[in-house]
Amino acid sequence: DVSAAISVADGAIRSIVFFGLGLVALGLYVLFYQATTRFDIHDEIEKDNVAVGVALAGNLIAMGLVVFKAVFGEFVSWQESLAGFITFAIAGFVLLFIIRMLVDIILLPSTRVSDELVKDRNIGVAYIESAVVISASLILVFAI
């Protein structure tokens, strides 16, 4: 049946488009994360700074969960689905940034996360930041 073949092809195209958008969102989040930190992530990872790598990985997992939620659900139309994806991705960027700032202010008031990650290479702080942003993204995914 021709309509069934068209339906399958249309579903495959939608999947490929939203997969690509998810990758773009993750790439943009890495750039956003770099812009909002006080150090160069690439340089620190090249210097074998595991703490920075763990913090980045935790943030990417958190953003990956947000992107999952952004692409999840019933496809209504291109316009509505793309608008929903973009809205949810931007909300994820903002939420994760705010959560990272709150970790600095509330959980580690006597020091800065960036100092602990870069100067002290404190992997414990990297785990704290990762756990908090992943938890916040899970709340966002399941609450909305």
Language-model segment annotations:
Residues 20-37, 94-109:
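Membrane-water interface of transmembrane alpha-helices
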